[in-house]
Amino acid sequence: MAEVLTGARIFDGARFLDGHALVIEAGEIAAILPEAEAPAKGRRAVPGILAPAFLDLQVNGGGGLMLDGTTDLDGLRRICAAHRALGTAGVLPTLITDTPKATAHVIALGIAAAEAQVPGFLGLHLEGPHLDPRRKGAHDPALIRPMTDEDLARLCDAARRLPALMVTLAPEAASPQQIAALAGAGAVVSLGHSDCSHDEAQAAFAAGARCATHLFNAMSQIGNRAPGLAGAVLAGKPGAGLIADGIHVHPAVMRLALGARPEGIFLVTDCMAFAGTDLTEMELGGRKVLRRDGRLTLADGTLAGADLTLPQAIAVLVRQVGIAPERALRMASAIPAALLGLQDRYGTLAPGRPADLVLLDEDFALREHRLSP
């Protein structure tokens, strides 16, 4: 029997539909129609907001585990499952700067996860090691290094074999030719952890980079005579992830950025093993990460990822930044889906689509979620 969800404001990926019902049959959306025209049987009132389930393209871990050179397939399943429990239909598990051996292990793991059809696994995000140590953030500077021909060959092969691959790199550590080769192999090249100039950033984007990693964090900032990487992102058209916890980027700066870029900026959590748990401490490459008052930091106070969920980020955008709910919801679903070329699968509620959806309350807290296997 069909399930008929009533009483919610339905966000279909573009607009809110009030007074409508969403009908689900066999795991798919069968119809969205005025409540007066909806079937009487199978009705269930779900006050709140029904919206497309989320995508998160930067998750370093979850469920008590980090993605690293020791993660096995069960561990990767656990990471993905932790995020699905938070309403996120798909993630790019993210490996931060590590050894060549660890990188090769994680790539092989990702290929195995794709073959095993791990629920929620969209591909991989390799954040480093080809970064600028001047903008290392919480990455281990001893492991940061320029890209070699061997690195490039490994990454291009991974891009061809994985369903999706995002590679965060700094233009200082990879040439335009290497960036072009990566993009040509199908990787989403994202600029980050970089102190590059505006001109260097533009050259990297011209070569094929089409995204920036955690906008404003660990990158050259906007100056009146030196616009930096942040300026190149805001003046151009690349995608850009944004950690909207109100800590990594001030709400006023987010407001300016979103005013400059009507499209392209999307939400990420940059979360760690803490996601979906009550953990208060963890180890990161032998260094302790502390979870205190909504912050994740190393002992010296350096931010080390975010203690954030996508519903929380949406609430920050709406309540603190002043962004319309429609846009905030798109930033957690349709916009990242489009960056990965998955707009026909995620980000929209429409007849014939899988019933991947979330139910949020009036404060954007997650109440329920429904995700395809």
Segments (PLM) and residue ranges:
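Residue-level marker for buried hydrophobic side chains located in beta-strands
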Residues: A53-L55, S190, L267-V268, V358
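Divalent metal-dependent hydrolysis catalytic cores, especially in the metallo-beta-lactamase
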Residues: N60-G62, R77-V106, P119-D132, R161-A174, ...
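C-terminal cap of metal-dependent C-N hydrolases
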Residues: A8, A338, Q343, T348-P373
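N-terminal metal-binding scaffold of metallo-dependent hydrolase/deaminase domains
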Residues: M1-A38, D363, H369-P373
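Active-site glycine- and acidic-residue-rich loops that bind
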Residues: T99-H105, E172-S175, V188-D195, I243-G259, ...
